[in-house]
A protein has these predicted regions:
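Conserved phosphate/oxyanion-binding catalytic-loop motifs
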Residues: 78
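C-terminal helical cap(s) of enzyme catalytic domains, especially alpha/beta-barrels
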Residues: 110-122
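Short, well-structured alpha-helical patches and their helix-loop capping segments
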Residues: 104-107, 116, 133, 140
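Glycine-rich phosphate-binding active-site loops on the catalytic face of alpha/beta enzymes
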Residues: 90-111, 149-152
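Conserved N-terminal beta1-alpha1 strand-loop-helix module at the mouth
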Residues: 1-74, 82-86, 90, 121-126, ...
Length: 152
């Protein structure tokens, strides 16, 4: 029997929940209250996308993710603005069970390799815009990634 998860998504910009990857209008909810609502509603996992533009905003979002993890009991995964292995570490140390690496970035395989060696492949996910990545990197995917997120 297949196991299905109900997953909620939070998009973070400047430490606040916004409406989407391309819509930075605030959701109108405090992000901690939103995460608690998901936690109390039977959601299995929250995926958080860090939409930061610079290191200062990235650190603010990491701090927000750490606060979310302190306030929920469900799995939290995060990704976004990952350009080096240290960014993966920041998400893990903020309490995320899994980290999402962007498959479209040229250095994603190097980051994933180092992260899966350090933290285990079950903690590393890859996001792609289309399934071409899967066919081009099939061996590496099995070795370094636990799940695939197709964002379309």
């Amino acid at each position: 029997m297949e196991h299905k998860n109900i997953v909620a998504t939070i998009y973070l910009k400047n430490g606040q929940a916004v409406k989407g990857m391309d819509n930075f209008e605030p959701m109108g909810w405090d992000v901690i209250s939103l995460a608690r609502l998901y936690n109390d509603s039977g959601i299995d996992k929250i995926i958080i996308f860090d939409l930061s533009d610079d290191d200062e905003e990235h650190e603010k979002n990491i701090h927000t993710i750490k606060n979310i993890n302190r306030n929920v009991e469900i799995k939290v995964c995060a990704g976004g603005n990952i350009s080096r292995f240290e960014d993966v570490k920041k998400f893990i140390y903020a309490g995320c069970l899994q980290v999402i690496v962007n498959g479209a970035k040229s250095n994603s395989m190097d980051i994933a390799r180092e992260a899966s060696d350090r933290f285990g492949k079950e903690r590393i996910l890859v996001s792609v815009a289309n399934v071409d990545f899967v066919f081009k990197h099939q061996e590496e995917m099995q070795e370094h990634f636990h799940e695939l997120l197709v964002l379309n």
